[in-house]
Amino acid sequence: MQRLLKFSGHGSRALFLARRWNSNIASGTAGTFQTTAKPLRSVKPTEAALALNGKFLESTNGNENGITSMGSIDWYTSWHGLGSKPFDATVQKALALPLEPTDIEIKPDGLIYLPEIKYRRILNRAFGAGGWGLVPRSQTIVTSKLVTREYGLVCHGQLVSVSRGEQDYFSETGIPTATEGCKSNALMRCCKDLGIGSELWDPVFIKRFKTEHCVEKFVTHIATSKKKKIWIRKDRSVEYPYKA
């Protein structure tokens, strides 16, 4: 048997809901009673499943049409300028300059890469300081081991590329640092569409660079005393946690 609903408040809204509920009980339609309240925002189930405790680090402010109420571009959702026109010859020349071998690093497993700060320097040289920026395109999703967020690269007022950055972390105290690493990862991925560091994906260049500037060495891990073979630049010495 359904119980009558009682409200201690005297507001008009409370009285209305109580009368509505009690009326439905009397008519036998209590199971169909609904309020008109709406959720604050909708979240896609797939995104919520990836978020830490079903939550994001930010709330979205994006507009579907990509234009804010003030008439400016909302880069959270807008695709303004993507593929609309090429940059001038001066910019393209700066972007196409070959990488300096001294700028390229190599990981112990043999993967060569360009440090993130070098990408920023190339962008500053091509577009000028303040002539480019990285804008968020999604909320920051935090899983039990990973931080990920989508970013867009905007140069001279037009969207150039969109990429998703990701960064591992090992404890909750490392989440703030991981969000910065995620941003840096997205920047490097976006720069691929501008041709920056394209040599790093060229098998011929990779083989030549490793032959001319790198060498494999047998080293010993200081903590475990295990021996292994690692890659290192010829102009560098073996560093912690390894010893020659």
UniProtKB/Swiss-Prot annotation:
- Bilayer-crossing residues are none
Q: Which Pfam families match?
A: Mgm101p (PF06420)
Where mainly found? mitochondrion
Instruction: Tell me which residues form the transit peptide.
Output: 1-22
From the Swiss-Prot or TrEMBL record, state where the protein is found: Mitochondrion matrix, Mitochondrion nucleoid
Keywords linked to the UniProt accession: DNA damage, DNA repair, DNA-binding, Mitochondrion, Mitochondrion nucleoid, Transit peptide
Q: What InterPro entries does the entry give?
A: Mgm101
**Which BP terms from GO are recorded?**
interstrand cross-link repair; mitochondrial genome maintenance; recombinational repair
- Coiled-coil region(s): none
Any one GO MF term held by the record is: single-stranded DNA binding
Q: Record's Gene Ontology CC terms?
A: mitochondrial chromosome
| Job of this protein | Performs an essential function in the repair of oxidatively damaged mtDNA that is required for the maintenance of the mitochondrial genome. Binds to DNA.
Family membership noted in the UniProt record: Belongs to the MGM101 family.
The protein, known as = Mitochondrial genome maintenance protein MGM101
Source species: Candida glabrata (strain ATCC 2001 / BCRC 20586 / JCM 3761 / NBRC 0622 / NRRL Y-65 / CBS 138) (Yeast)
